[in-house]
């Protein structure tokens, strides 16, 4: 815990088989990089191969999508005119992975080409050198022909086939990483870069971020886990995920505060405070007038050492003043929620003030440190809130096996990138949202130990954790379901988004894949005894 800020205002706010087509070798020395994806090429020929791959990459106009400069990314996306059913990528990926057998073939660093797991493909390469005259046609497939005075073979590189090989290469690289076969993993991650340039839209971007995560893990260059507020704001504007999270949590809190004259929200994830103006507005419209509203906002230190929590408080206070809500605010800077202690929160008796605890995309980070989540559960029990609202990603990225985590995250983030492609938003917002998600991908793939904080778990896993910690579920009513559905109807490009009720919880999904889940909890009867402070 580093510091706190307090602000009060009386009236204020806020294949497995080898490919049948290969380049023959007349003398040993196969190159591992191409052999691993089904081709036999002599090391002495690699200069020619590299030249041809570079020519092919240029012909396909592939761009490595990972420039964090906003104007560059926005310009790139504004020129991307690919249109498709946005559900196709994730469904196609599901099919590809279901046909992929990740069982190890016992590769080792010293394996020869016969030990490598070949990835099936049907790209046919001309045996002779490229001539200077070529024709390239961009369509569902790319056809390149060479012209000369003699008849030459035709090189056909189908985008779909390269997409299949891309997915298989990603999986094979992850398997090599899990087996600590870094030589093969390095070869594969380079091949992924070549294959990604042939893809369009979401698949290229997803593959690029996963390739970055794999490369960082292989070479030991680990990313810093720091997501700027500006990236999150772009994500908020681009897709309904955070809007859904805030709306459903606020609805549960509003119902829990019904008839209360003084209320206190403890927000474990204050960020820019974007969640709370809507709740204060709803409280202001309550029959009989609004209650006194106290907000405690908890957040990490700012990367620029600015007093950002105080700034959030002032903005909320100004809003509260315009709607005539009595407002009090305190901000706590904490490196981890596990640093919290109930005595810091200036809790008042339940007879005079009702408390709600809110956490949006925060609790999963505690899984990185043994005992941290249990410590926070203990603090919540001491707070004795009327309700605890929790929003988390609906994914399991916290398993012990790297390959399982990689596969699950590839499915999950492919769906998220699909949803971004399907939205009608400003290119800059979409580009920055992709960077926001890309940072998560790199953390899931590249990091381990306490550095791996994106340890998402499913709703069922969180149910087990809360039940074991002495909490019982609070069902989110049909009213919240209907209003959340209306929210999506108002969101541009929201046709692919779905709201589902799951045993009293609400899930937001893209087509058939759930993305996030909102749940609400209260102390079980046995844990409702009064604790003096």
Curated annotation (Swiss-Prot):
- Its protein name is DELLA protein 2
The GRAS domain extends over 157-522
Among PROSITE patterns, the record links this protein to:
GRAS
Q: Print the keywords alphabetically.
A: Gibberellin signaling pathway, Nucleus, Transcription, Transcription regulation, Ubl conjugation
One GO biological process this protein is involved in is: cellular response to phosphate starvation
Q: What does this protein do?
A: Probable transcriptional regulator that acts as a repressor of the gibberellin (GA) signaling pathway. Probably acts by participating in large multiprotein complexes that repress transcription of GA-inducible genes. Upon GA application, it is degraded by the proteasome, allowing the GA signaling pathway. Together with DELLA1, required to enable arbuscule development during arbuscular mycorrhizal (AM) symbiosis with AM fungi (e.g. Glomus versiforme) via the regulation of RAM1 which, in turn, regulates various AM genes (e.g. NSP1, NSP2, PT4, LEC5, RAM2, EXO70I, STR and RAD1).
Where is this gene product found?
Nucleus
The record's InterPro entries line, in alphabetical order, gives: DELLA_N_sf, TF_DELLA_N, TF_GRAS
Stated induction or repression of this protein's expression? Accumulates upon phosphate (Pi) deprivation. Expressed during arbuscular mycorrhizal (AM) symbiosis with AM fungi (e.g. Glomus versiforme).
Name any GO cellular component annotation.
Answer: nucleus
Comp. bias (Basic and acidic residues): 1-12
Motif span (DELLA motif)? Answer: 31-35
Motif (LXXLL motif) positions are 363-367
The segment annotated Required for possible homodimerization runs over 166-203
Q: How does it assemble?
A: May be a homodimer.
Which organism does this record belong to? Medicago truncatula (Barrel medic)
Record bears the keyword Plastid: no
**Chain residue ranges for the region called Leucine repeat I (LRI):** 164-218
Q: Where is this motif: VHIID?
A: 263-267
Motif (LxCxE motif) on chain? 171-175
Gene name linked to the record:
DELLA2
